[in-house]
Amino acid sequence: MKIISMSMDSWIQRAALMLLGLVIVAPFFGWTASIVGYAEPLENAAKMTGATDAAMNLNPGVLPDYTVGGFSGPIGTLISAGVGTVLTLIVAFGAGRLLES
């Protein structure tokens, strides 16, 4: 049982490092998307059909457009990526604990 535990710890460490790496490069992807003029396809379709004019924004979300108020684009994206990763891990570990019991 000890061998399984050690390999699980190693797997978790590798996964955590991979997630940390993705969080760190997230602002780069946001920056390159703005450079090439990328826009979400659903937003493009809404603009083409005129749906954005009639839309009401009732709840912009916790981190709208992957930004954090008061921070510049890349820094806000980095914070948003970190928050999203942590929340996802909390939900995943919680679900894992429920499935184990």
Curated annotation (Swiss-Prot):
| Protein origin, superkingdom | Archaea
Question: What does the protein in this record do?
Answer: May be involved in metal transport.
Give yes or no: UniProt keyword Membrane: yes
**Which InterPro entries does the record cross-reference, listed alphabetically?**
PDGLE_dom
Location of this chain's protein in the cell: Cell membrane
Q: What is its main location?
A: membrane
Instruction: Tell me the membrane topology, using the record's own terms.
Output: Single-pass membrane protein
- Any one of the GO CC terms: plasma membrane
Q: What is this protein called?
A: Putative metal transport protein HQ_3622A
Which keywords describe this protein according to UniProt?
Answer: Cell membrane, Membrane, Signal, Transmembrane, Transmembrane helix, Transport
Pfam families attached here?
PDGLE
Query: Which residue positions does the secretion signal occupy?
Result: 1-32
Q: What are the TM regions of this chain, as residue ranges?
A: 75-95
- Keyword Signal in the entry? The reply is yes
Organism of derivation: Haloquadratum walsbyi (strain DSM 16790 / HBSQ001)
